[in-house]
């Protein structure tokens, strides 16, 4: 490796990190439930759905990050600048509902993990998850963005090891994996499961947040003066290159985790009953592969809940600030957003049912995040020379159309009782 390559790499490393925080949204408890269900019911059939979803996510997250870097503003802030006050409030309300639904899934997932590991009652598990996430947010709130990112990356490593460990005990079938790369379905139910997988993968709050993360990270690493002079210094091209690398590696890891969960279920749980809940999947994994693998799986679920609920609260704060120009202390927001999840846990609602409801709410919110993102990144008056090319516009809108159509289909099937 030449000295020049070494210097470039040395300069590149400090710019990496935001995508790994956003990637946590792609390995939250909702993904665990969707991917385990897909593998247990249909074996390797829907591997292609996860592969396509991951490619879609890479494009969407890059556009969000590019929007933030080029404009210096987050997606919510840009929308807030272009909307009337009533429109801003209405948009904020739907975004907050989506944020609450996201938090619901993540807190419940973490509480379930504590219950599986230590027998902690679900309500108290939710309280513990909320308290730990608040501690993580204190780090971020004190301006220690790099430390916050390091903690989240550490949790992402635990998630990866926890969810993929079972594959060493029950290796998937290579021919099954190859067969799963061929796009096809097996009846209407498999379409519903595929829509659920896609809905659990592309998360609205990750789209909103990434455009803010890149600016917070740059200001923390390089200082506000460097961040503000990005255009005049020619720094932007290097930032965008670093962002593409950041997203590629972060979402490749997230995609590997999601596909690994499906492969684990296909190899060890196919045809077994009771695996359509996280508790049932844990029991089946422990029974089929041994209690150690079951414990490691639960540890991965715990890390997933802790990381994703912290990132979700961070996203909610940025959404409110961008749309309403109001910055409520993030710990106050964390307390308020925790209440719905604790009420549901305290009421004794079935956790998997709550996860399903939360995924439907997320499906409603996806078009409101993706369509404005595509429109803004295509406008030269917003993006200048970095506006999407015709090819990227076509690809972006095609991805948006597929995601929105599948999520609306999921909502329809769920509301009509067919899901």
Language-model features: where?
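Membrane-interface "cap" regions at the ends of multi-pass membrane proteins
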Residues: 1-30, 86, 157, 193, ...
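Flexible loop linkers connecting adjacent transmembrane helices
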Residues: 2, 34-39, 62-87, 139-146, ...
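Juxtamembrane transmembrane-helix boundary signature
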Residues: 22, 49-82, 91-97
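Helix-loop-helix module between adjacent transmembrane segments
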Residues: 56-61, 86-106, 114-140, 199-200, ...
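Extracellular/periplasmic helix-exit of transmembrane alpha-helices
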Residues: 57-70, 214-229, 252-280
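Loop-to-transmembrane helix boundary motifs in multi-pass membrane proteins
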Residues: 86-88, 123-126, 292-294, 298, ...
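Transmembrane alpha-helical segments of multi-pass small-molecule transport proteins
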Residues: 92-96, 117-139, 157-162, 327-343, ...
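Hydrophobic alpha-helical segments and their helix-loop junctions in multi-pass secondary transporters
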Residues: 156-182, 191-212, 373-381, 406-418
């Amino acid at each position: 490796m030449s000295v020049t390559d070494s210097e470039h790499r040395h300069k590149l490393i400090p710019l990496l990190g935001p995508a790994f925080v956003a990637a946590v949204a792609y390995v939250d408890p909702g993904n665990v439930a969707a991917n385990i269900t897909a593998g247990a019911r249909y074996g390797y059939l829907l591997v292609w759905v996860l592969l396509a979803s991951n490619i879609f996510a890479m494009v969407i997250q890059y556009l969000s990050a590019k929007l933030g870097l080029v404009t210096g503003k987050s997606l919510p802030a840009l929308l807030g600048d272009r909307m009337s006050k009533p429109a801003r409030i209405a948009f904020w309300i739907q975004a907050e509902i989506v944020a609450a639904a996201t938090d619901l899934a993540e807190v419940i997932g973490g509480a379930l993990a504590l219950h599986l590991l230590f027998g902690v009652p679900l309500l108290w598990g939710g309280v513990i998850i909320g308290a730990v996430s608040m501690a993580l947010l204190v780090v971020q709130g004190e301006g220690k963005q790099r430390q916050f990112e390091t903690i989240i990356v550490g949790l992402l490593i635990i998630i990866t090891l926890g969810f993929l460990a079972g594959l060493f005990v029950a290796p998937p079938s290579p021919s099954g994996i190859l067969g799963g790369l061929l796009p096809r379905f097996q009846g209407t139910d498999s379409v519903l499961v595929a829509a659920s997988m896609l809905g659990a993968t592309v998360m609205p709050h990750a789209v909103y947040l990434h455009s803010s993360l890149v600016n917070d990270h740059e200001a923390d690493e390089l200082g506000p003066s460097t961040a503000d002079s990005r255009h005049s210094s020619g720094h932007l091209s290097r930032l965008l290159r670093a962002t593409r690398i950041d997203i590629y590696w972060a979402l490749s890891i997230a995609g590997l985790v999601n596909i690994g969960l499906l492969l684990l279920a296909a190899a060890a749980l196919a045809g077994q009953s009771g695996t359509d809940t996280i508790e049932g999947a844990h029991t089946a994994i422990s029974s089929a592969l041994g209690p150690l693998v079951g414990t490691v799986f639960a540890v991965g679920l715990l890390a997933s809940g802790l990381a994703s609920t912290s990132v979700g609260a961070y996203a909610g704060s940025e959404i409110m600030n961008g749309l309403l120009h109001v910055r409520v202390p993030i710990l106050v927001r964390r307390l308020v957003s925790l209440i719905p999840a604790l009420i549901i846990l305290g009421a004794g609602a079935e956790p998997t049912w709550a996860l399903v409801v939360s995924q439907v709410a997320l499906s409603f919110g996806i078009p409101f995040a993706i369509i404005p993102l595509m429109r803004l990144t295509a406008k030269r008056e917003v993006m200048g020379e970095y506006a999407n090319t015709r090819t990227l516009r076509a690809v972006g809108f095609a991805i948006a159309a597929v995601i929105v159509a599948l999520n609306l289909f999921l909502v329809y099937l769920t509301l009509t009782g067919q899901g």
